[in-house]
Amino acid sequence: MVTLTVELSEELANALAQFVKRVGFSEMRSNAVDDFEAYLIRDALDRVRIGLANAGFSPR
């Protein structure tokens, strides 16, 4: 398990939260070497989204 701690301005945190909300699987797949890696990327971004939501950045 890897734990990441980052410091972001509110502007950056909000922009990142918007990105992880909007990015679709097709973009993930087009940047992955195969489907398996695309699913790993999706799962990792979901954890980032949860972390941002826990910090108060959860766009609708």
Report residues per predicted region.
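Positively charged, low-complexity terminal tracts
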Residues: 1-7, 11-60
